[in-house]
Design a protein with these regions (language model features):
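Extracellular glycan-recognition surfaces and repeat-rich motifs
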Residues: 43-65
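Extracellular/lumenal carbohydrate-interaction signature centered on repeated Trp-anchored short motifs
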Residues: 82-93, 187-190
């Protein structure tokens, strides 16, 4: 069993994360250099925050044992951790999360409308054998700019607005390399902990094809800047397990 909120500080190079967010959210020109300072208690758990130019950032803080709180007020930013998880041995990821208020109306498939109050992201190392021609063509430039450890594909589990549970959506920023799976929406219960357990290996096969061998990063985000809305979200007890 691998617990995400273990008390281990990590500090990966910023250009790896820059490459990651090229896929995950904004164009690379919007990324601020380096890591932002976040709540010391969260930082001690090994998380780093990524901010974006001209965008207000969220506030991340510890909210108990193995719990992260994110307050988002017309803002967007993410916290991330580097991981080395053998996905063939520990293919399940479980966590609990909750929201304070309903998500503002948004559209995950449209740039500038794709807010989501809470999301969990998983990234995977680049896999040349199963990469598309466009991914292979782009790879040398990414590695030249951000290093060989820049991730290949991104899978995110999203608390959406009106999208149906289970719907798979291609990121308007990451394209075919970033797929979003809706887990909760504006009809989900508020103010109570809701449990999730996902088979990352099966989900990857369904949306990308092929089999990843490992996970390289995990992230938590909140995005309310397009809708100029406010929300408070919580995520706790994240862990990878074989069953």
């Amino acid at each position: 069993m691998f617990y995400i909120f273990q008390n281990k500080k990590t500090a990966p190079r910023w250009y790896i994360i820059a490459g990651l967010f090229f896929f995950v959210h904004y164009n690379i020109s919007h990324l601020k250099s380096g890591f932002a300072e976040i709540s010391g208690s969260v930082e001690k758990l090994g998380w780093r925050e990524i901010q974006f130019v001209d965008k207000k950032s969220n506030r991340f803080s510890k909210c108990g044992q193995g719990c992260i709180q994110v307050d988002s007020d017309s803002a967007v930013s993410m916290i991330q951790r580097s991981l080395k998880i053998d996905i063939t041995e520990k293919k399940f990821l479980s966590w609990e999360w909750k929201l304070a208020v309903p998500p503002a109306p948004s559209d995950l498939a449209r740039k500038g409308k794709d807010d989501r109050p809470l999301a969990v992201y998983i990234t995977f190392p680049f896999d040349y054998q199963n990469a598309s021609m466009s991914e292979r063509a782009m790879r040398p430039l990414l590695e030249f700019s951000y290093g060989s450890e820049a991730p290949g594909r991104v899978l995110s589990y999203v608390w959406a607005s009106a999208e149906s549970k289970g719907k798979v959506i291609e990121s308007p920023f990451g394209g075919t390399q970033h797929k979003m799976i809706v887990k909760r929406n504006n009809r989900s219960r508020l103010g109570v902990w809701l449990e999730e357990k996902v088979d990352i290996l099966a989900d990857y096969k369904d949306v990308f094809g092929g089999e990843p061998k490992s996970v390289s990063h995990i992230l938590i985000s909140s995005d309310t800047d397009d809708t100029l809305s406010f929300n408070t979200g919580f995520v706790k007890n994240m862990q990878f397990t074989p069953h």
